Amino acid sequence: MAASQVDQKRALNKLKHDLEPFRTAIVGAYGVLTWEKQYYAGVVFGVISCLYLVLWYLDLSLITLLSLLGVISILLNYAFPMVSRLIFGGVNWDGDQEAKFEDVCGQVCAVKGSLVVWYEYLFNERKSTVFVIVMSLGLLAMAWIGAIINNLLLMYLATLLILMWPGLQNKDIFKAITQRASKIINEKIQCGKRKLQ
């Protein structure tokens, strides 16, 4: 094996070890996010919408919101392993669940590797002029959009997109949309060719 493959395997094993107390929740969340059942898409949409509705209603300042999120994450990190042993202690961990857990850990490692590559690319010393111009225009466009549209709405839409993405990919929604769009475009082209003849 190459050194990078050994490092990837070591990182995967470390991640699996670190996430071991949360594996039942991770496998359950993976099933919900990939829409193993038809109604999971509605559940994801509803939960996200309710959370953001509560955030909108409470109208917390950024510092208060970050502090509360920190407290909740610390409490969950402390209490969840104990509670999960009580709730899921009798559940048998089978090969299918282990395969899903390994798949999720592999995907997380792949995303982490991609982020490291992007970080190294974005923050290397030499940048081309085109890169600087394109990044500056992109960031200015994002700043302009952020100034025009409510930030909570933007975060809601971003969260919705991020959490719906695995299910959309798993159900081949994008593939169906692109096939339908290419079919419509091809029909329009054929219709235009017939009119020209």
Curated annotation (Swiss-Prot):
It comes from the Eukaryota. The chain crosses the membrane at residues 43-63, 64-84, 129-149, 150-170. InterPro entries: ER_autophagy_membrane_reg. Pfam families: RHD_RETREG1-3. GO terms for cellular component: endoplasmic reticulum tubular network; membrane. It is a multi-pass membrane protein. It is found in: Membrane. The keyword Repeat does not apply. Keywords: Membrane, Transmembrane, Transmembrane helix. Its main location: membrane. One of its GO terms (biological process) is mitochondrion organization. Belongs to the ARL6ip family. This is ADP-ribosylation factor-like protein 6-interacting protein 1. It comes from Drosophila melanogaster.
